Amino acid sequence: MNSPHLRVPQLVAIPAGPAGVDVLAAAISAAVADPALVIAPIPDVSPHVTEHLRISLISAIAPQRELTDPLVQVVLTTSGSTGNPKGVMHSLAAIAHSTRALHERLGGAGHWVCALPLHTSAGFMTVARAVLSGTTATPMSSLGGAEPFTSEAFIHAAEIALAHEGRHYISLVPQQASRLLQSARAGELLARFDAVLLGGQAIPADLIATLRDTGATPVLSYGSTE
C-alpha cells in the first residue's frame, strides 16, 4: 500500500485550444500553494496529438514513480535528440529563477502570448512566467492543434495581449515566425512586442534579418527542459 505521503507526478491533461492555458495556470498556482504537489502536463488527444504519442509521454513521466527529491514539483517531457520522450524533473525554485533571469534580460516582466504546445518546455514556461509574475498569458486559438496556426489567430491574440499596459512577449518556432511575416498586419503587431523569442529549431539568418527589418526584436532561445 502506498504511503499517504507518497509524492508521485500528478498528470494534468491539457485540452487543445485556449482552455489549456487556464488549466495549466491553475495547476501551476496549485503547485505554488502546495509544495508537496508535483504536476506533469500532458496534452489531450487532438488532430496533432495521437493516442500513441500521449501514451509515450505518460510512460516517460512514470506517474507511478515515487519522487524522493522534495524540491521536485514539475515533470516535463522532452524527446531530446533521440526522439524518445523522457521525463525531466524541475523545482519551482529553478523555474522561478529562470523566469526572473529572462525578465531581467528582456527588461522586466510582461504579458505573454501563448503559441506553443503547453506540455513542452517552451509552451509551459510562457504560462509559468505569467503566473509567477502576476501578468497575463493570452492563448492563440491554435494551441494544441485545436486549429491550424494562422496569422489571423495570432492577430486576434496579439491585439488582446497588447491592450494590457506593460511589456509584451511571445515565444515562437522559426516556422511560425516565417508564416506571420507573410501578413503585413501580423508583422506590424510583432514589431510592437518587446521581444520575440525564437527557438526549438535551426534559425535561418535571413529570418532574423527580416524580423529586424519589420521592427521586431528577435531573441534567440533554446529548449530548457534539461
Predicted segments with their positions:
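Conserved AMP-binding A3 loop
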Residues: L71-R100, G107
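Conserved S/T- and glycine-rich ATP-binding loop of Class I adenylate-forming
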Residues: T78-S81, W112, V127, I170, ...
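Gly/Ser/Thr-rich phosphate-binding loop
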Residues: Q182-E226
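Conserved pre-ATP/AMP-binding loop-to-beta segment of ANL
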Residues: A16-V21, A60-T77, G108-H111
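Structural motif
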Residues: L11-A13, I39, V113, Y169-S171, ...
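Glycine-rich helix-loop-beta junction characteristic of Rossmann-like nucleotide cofactor-binding loops
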Residues: H103-G107, E159-A163, G187-L189
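AMP-binding/adenylate-forming
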Residues: L92-H97, H111-R179, V219
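A short helix-loop-beta submotif of the ANL/AMP-binding
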Residues: V12-D44, G110-H111, T120, A128-S142
